[in-house]
Amino acid sequence: ASAFAVQNLAKAGDNIVSSTDLYGGTWNLFANTLKDQGVEVRFVDPTEPENFKNATDENTRAYYAETLPNPKLCVFPIEEVADIGRKMGIPLIMDNTAAPVLCRPIEHGAAVIVYSCTKYIGGQGTSIGGMIIDGGNFDWEKAGVDRQPALNTPDPSYHGAVWVEAVKPIGPVSYIIKARTTLLRDLGSAMSPF
């Protein structure tokens, strides 16, 4: 889910800004796999929300953090970082795996939430799964072509659809519709029938 959440917005040459406080698997995804795909991840100390702003440039597509990072369990400043990002056209993607019952990041301004079903639902690593939730609270169109080109320019892989325009009649769901119609199609993940 974390990979899809980022890949839905960032391509080679783009970057995201991430908290340094991450689960080891996510850290390696960001430091190695995304790097190999040409997506730079800029790690910042999350105790100062301004660090996210200071690491941002014209190619920054998202901020990423964990609500209660594993193993530190320190509380991430969701509202502060979400506000910084929103003013710059950058969504905050939150991994809420450790606190699904305790915290509702969308209510604090996060735009996208991811969960590791492997950890929370399975618990022993015998199942693999992830979940992405689009909060429907981020104005992707207002973020614009320069900040969010993946959703504001024609997608040649889907008949030239401009996602923010294509889904307007059904609501602010361009982010999740693009994930379902492109990443699920291309990378072989399967949605549960239930």
Give the positions of each predicted feature.
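Conserved PLP-enzyme active-site core in the AAT-like
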Residues: 1-194
